[in-house]
């Protein structure tokens, strides 16, 4: 099975939604994969990478958070 590049999937989904919208990291995964904590962590790691590259923002309760410091539920959006 080929390795999935979650960075591309995150960016594609965010571009599809538009600049004013956010996504939950779980939306990147298929329904079956959403229950796999290892895959969920891979998506969150991809989000951290994109945020550190200034391509997206990671938010909690509508506020941008440090990609290296967040814990708990997050949302992703294109960099404003």
Q: Which residues make up each language-model segment?
A:
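Long, charged, low-complexity intrinsically disordered regions
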Residues: 1-3, 38, 80
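Positively charged, polyanion-binding regions of nucleic-acid-associated proteins
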Residues: 1-22
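Short acidic, hydrophobic short linear motifs in intrinsically disordered regions
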Residues: 20-31
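Short helix-coil junctions and helix-kink-helix linkers
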Residues: 29-40
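Charge-enriched amphipathic alpha-helical scaffolds
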Residues: 38-59
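Short, cationic-aromatic polyanion-contact patches
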Residues: 61-80
């Amino acid at each position: 099975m080929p390795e999935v590049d979650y960075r591309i999937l995150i960016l594609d989904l965010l571009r599809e939604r538009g600049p004013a919208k956010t996504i939950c990291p779980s939306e990147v995964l298929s329904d079956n994969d959403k229950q796999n904590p290892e895959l969920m962590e891979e998506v969150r790691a991809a989000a951290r990478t994109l945020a550190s590259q200034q391509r997206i923002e990671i938010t909690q309760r509508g506020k941008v958070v440090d990609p290296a410091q967040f814990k708990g539920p997050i949302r992703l959006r294109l960099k404003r």
